[in-house]
Amino acid sequence: PTEGSITIAGSVPGPATKEIVSYLPDAAWLPDWMRVEQLVEMFHDFYADFDPARAGEMLAKLELDPKAPLKTLSKGNKEKVQLILAMSRAAKLYLLDEPIGGVDPAARDYILHTILSNYSEDATVVISTHLIGDIEPVLDEAIFLKEGKIFAHRTVDEIRETEGMSVDEYFREGFKC
């Protein structure tokens, strides 16, 4: 798109909106030299809504060592740490870019469970992904972009009822090569 505007909760993106948005990028962005526990401390210092106890619980469930330097973790475990940090905030808006893209299929279920059981009840969760089939069970709505424009914006129930297909099938049909 060449024009338009973006607002978050009625405000132009800036320092105030960063307080209510928890963003998980699709690429590793945390300093590799830091230990996991230092990252938890950093997030606690930066974000008033960060819950270090929640982060600790999730790290323990995944058997991730808080004392481990990030650089010693596998790619999948680094992504899990990033997800834990993002989901340990009580944000109003969670923007998750390809949260299951780099992890093995067995870990995907845990990640989806982590997302669903750790976001604030009054929050909105936006997940950007190409792995529609894996996240379809947790979707309420789907927005499909094609060549920079909204191709479709519908509830998943509407897609299933009116199109007679799953959201994944609808996606594949709309984006055939």
Protein language model regions, located:
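Conserved ABC transporter NBD signature motif
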Residues: 3-17
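ABC-family P-loop ATPase nucleotide-binding domains
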Residues: 23-81
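Catalytic Walker B motif of ABC-type/P-loop ATPase nucleotide-binding domains
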Residues: 94-98, 103
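Helical segment within the ABC ATPase nucleotide-binding domain
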Residues: 108-121
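Conserved H-loop
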Residues: 123-131
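A short, surface-exposed alpha-helical micro-motif characterized by mixed small hydrophobic
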Residues: 135-137
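ABC ATPase "signature
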Residues: 153-154
